[in-house]
Amino acid sequence: MKTITRNHYIQRINQVVNYINNHLNETIAVEKLAQTANLSPFHFCRIFKAITDESPIAFVARLRIETAAQLLRYSSLPIETIAFNIGYETPAALSKAFKLQYGFSPTQYRNDKEKYIVKQETIHPTLTLKVPKIVELAAKKVIYVSQKGAYGMVDYGRAYEQLWGVVKEQKLFTKGIESIGIFHDDPKITDVTLQRADVCLAVHKPAIPVGEVSCRTIAGGLYAVFSYQGSYDQLQAVCDAAMRWVVGSDYELRDEPLFEKYLNDARRTPAEKLKTEIYVPIQSVGR
């Protein structure tokens, strides 16, 4: 695809992905996704696969199974509720799809916290964190560039060049712009080639999507905020520790992705002095 054409389609596919994330509990028809992208169903399927390397049907199916795995590991929701919340008509349908994908049942996975869905060598060592702050956040408007692949290999430099270029072009500069990373997948569950990340700047003026840069809102609500100082290489271990805290707390995960806020400039700061806040969306158990 030519760059201009590809960027145009990226905007449309980003809208579709956001729609899918927000409607996993519903029947998701290809025709509806095509309508969201303002494309014919035939062309939509081809373009979606060209951008994401998956068909729409495969993408939705994978997201449902991986969301189920996350909820089984990190929430106390009954399997029946999980099944209905992510679009399965019956718990048996979820169990069949889960076992077909991973080789064991949802119940076996929930009861054995040592089970890994991806290869164990891809999982980082354990790490201990201080108790987080529990805060109520307002929603944040962000501009972002979506990237796919192993989280440690995300090209932050190129993404931030694009984002700051939009800030300059659209005169979005104000105090309080924040550098944020949104991570949609759990590396224990999703293959490294399919992990999705949004490199973001939180802005305080209305922005217009352009090129590969899209706009979205980070949901407000209750978050557990973990503070970490050190190399970004350890951030996955930090997130793992945050999830262990959730499992042992009086909270459970809310159906939103966690995000990281980067408090200093990695280009000018020694790795051991880099400061990051990890925001984990939570709610009281049984809410």
Regions found by a protein language model. Name each.
Residues 1-15, 54-55:
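Short, Lys/Arg-enriched, Trp-marked, Pro/Gly-tolerant hinge/linker segments that flank
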Residues 5-9, 22, 37, 60:
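Residue-level marker of regulatory loop/turn positions in helix-turn-helix DNA-binding domains and
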Residues 14, 30-31, 37-42, 46:
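Hydrophobic, proline/glycine-rich low-complexity stretches
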Residues 18, 42, 47-50, 54, ...:
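A solvent-exposed interaction/effector surface
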Residues 22-26, 74:
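Short helix-capping/hinge SLiMs at alpha-helix to coil transitions
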Residues 27-29, 78:
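Residues at or immediately flanking beta-strands
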